[in-house]
Amino acid sequence: MKRTYQPSVTKRKRTHGFLVRSKTRGGRAVLAARRAKGRKRLAV
């Protein structure tokens, strides 16, 4: 049986990347929350 996690940089960026997060209101909320928490990395 194939494992569920098949890494791909392209897919990773397109779904969880900074630009994608910036586009939607919810995504911007995620970035704001991570900034407030003091995360070193805001997005992938």
UniProtKB/Swiss-Prot annotation:
A Pfam family the protein falls into: Ribosomal_L34
Family: Belongs to the bacterial ribosomal protein bL34 family.
Protein name in the entry: Large ribosomal subunit protein bL34
Stretches the record annotates as Disordered: 24-44
A GO CC annotation given for this chain: ribosome
Coiled coil: none
Keyword line: Ribonucleoprotein, Ribosomal protein
Family annotation (NCBIfam families): rpmH_bact (TIGR01030)
